[in-house]
């Protein structure tokens, strides 16, 4: 109740939101057999960090010296870009949202060619559009980082049978033979 009252100052609006929360929560409890839908543990009294995978990728990139990121938002990779945007000043990074994925990869190639530690982030459908720019990076021997947030199936949504289609696409993306390094983390440590 305290969180809802803090968010909604008007008593009438606060009461309506508390009622809506209780109804929704009750439906969730009934649906999963009497246990809460989501249990958030108390904050531990230590230096542990609680964050999602996209934030971890963004922090890792910033720690590695990434100082330029450009992207066209595409879930599930958008979180990396928005985390960078929110912390651009802290990371001393240039953050640029562009009109499409083709522009994003070409700007990353240009920035890297000029000496920036540059990256972009996307998902399968956006990565398909980046393949020609990836070929440009290959022919000019310009190192770029593309965060490809893998979807659970061959397109947006959840397929009947899941697969690693985005990873398969990344193995052979671009024209011609040039070196590629693919990293697919399997747990928090990697």
Where in this protein do the model-derived segments appear?
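Gly-rich Lys/Arg/Thr-decorated short loops/hinges at beta-loop-alpha junctions or inter-strand turns
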Residues: 5, 33-46, 61-66, 83-91, ...
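Aromatic-enriched
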Residues: 1-53
